[in-house]
UniProtKB/Swiss-Prot annotation:
A biological process from GO: glycolytic process
Enzyme class: transferase
Predominant place of localization: cytoplasm
Reactions this protein catalyses: D-glucose + ATP = D-glucose 6-phosphate + ADP + H(+)
Any GO molecular function: glucokinase activity
Record's keyword terms, sorted: ATP-binding, Cytoplasm, Glycolysis, Kinase, Nucleotide-binding, Transferase
Organism of derivation: Klebsiella pneumoniae (strain 342)
Entry's family note: Belongs to the bacterial glucokinase family.
Positions annotated to bind ATP: G8, D9, V10, G11, G12, T13
Entry's EC annotation: 2.7.1.2
Protein name: Glucokinase
GO cellular component, one term: cytosol
Length: 321
């Protein structure tokens, strides 16, 4: 008889829940709920389990915020809860709450060739560290290492490291954003809001007044080639994505590959392919040769957060992935 566990991927707007076959890791019956419609994450879980008429004893839910102890307070939502209390209320024998990029990193060993698009480099080296990052509402970062037949995710808040410009144009962008924001992190340029920041800084540096655009509008105008400033912003976004990925590769020697997740890049995939992304990735001066062979992959799996939550739970329960 198939034994299922609950898995979830929760962001600032939506909560996506599904079932994971504990034997195979297969994800099924995924459903998305608006977080605004429910008073708590526990309430969403109860609705899901009731709708699907299923009883589970284990669960793993990935959330887009730091997880540092029993108390979880979401960054972009009002939900806050005790993991132990939620586990007790739901009657679970085991409940894991993990960072969203912990889940994405744990999905990587489960991905198949059709879930990936490669951008340069050679083949990954088995057993070597892996990096994963992704731009969305913010900039998520994690690393993954293989130790004693177990995958160990190393989450953090790498999206909040300093934005490090490496060209005259990027330096001008930094000065414009510093005057407006104070500290300028990588997330301030590598995210949906970050794309708008790039556009605004480009326009303001030319002494003009920027329009009040949304990230989608910047992307659409860039792809339609109807706005030079938007096209410059999107081009610069791709280059800086490359630089940041190259920095991750240098930091931990990620010869197992660098993986890009998040919902932004797939929206302009052809533009990204033709951009200066890989050039930015390899632009490491004396260490260009070090990163040249490191492959970069775009994850195109529909639900890497759910897949990785299931993988994390299965490994925690004693399975070898």
């Amino acid at each position: 008889m198939t034994k299922f566990a609950l898995v979830g991927d929760v962001g600032g707007t939506n909560a996506r829940l599904a079932l994971c076959d504990l034997a195979s890791g297969e994800i099924s019956r995924a459903k998305t709920y608006s977080g605004l419609d429910y008073p708590s994450l526990e309430a969403v879980v109860r609705v899901y389990l009731e709708e699907h008429q299923v009883t589970v004893n284990e669960g793993c839910i990935a959330i887009a915020c730091p997880i540092t102890g029993d108390w979880v307070a979401m960054t972009n939502h009002t939900w806050a809860f005790s993991i132990a209390e939620m586990k007790r209320n739901l009657g679970f024998a085991h409940l894991e709450i993990i960072n969203d990029f912990t889940a994405v990193s744990m999905a990587i060993p489960m991905l198949k060739a059709e879930h990936l698009i490669q951008f340069g480099g050679s083949a990954p080296v088995a057993g070597k560290p892996i990096a994963v990052y992704g731009a969305g509402t913010g900039l998520g970062v994690a690393h993954l290492v293989h130790v004693d037949k177990r995958w160990v995710s190393l989450p953090g808040e790498g999206g909040h490291v300093d934005f490090a410009p490496n060209s005259e144009e990027e330096g001008i962008i930094l000065e414009e954003l510093r005057a407006e924001l104070g500290h300028v992190s990588a997330e301030r340029v590598l995210s949906g809001p970050g794309l708008v920041n790039l556009y605004r800084a480009i326009v303001k540096s030319d002494g003009r007044l920027p329009e009040n655009l949304q990230p989608r509008e910047v992307t659409e105008r860039a792809l339609a080639d109807s706005c030079t400033d938007c096209r410059r912003a999107l081009s610069l976004f791709c280059v800086i994505m490359g630089r940041f990925g190259g920095n991750l590769a240098l930091t931990l020697g990620t010869f197992g590959g660098v993986y890009i997740a998040g919902g932004i890049v797939p929206r302009f995939l052809e533009f990204f392919k033709a951009s200066g992304f890989r050039g930015g990735f390899e632009d490491k001066g004396r260490f260009k040769a070090y990163v040249q062979d490191i492959p970069v992959y775009l994850i195109v799996h529909e639900n890497p957060g759910l897949l990785g939550s299931g993988a994390h739970l299965r490994q925690t329960l004693g399975q070898v992935l």
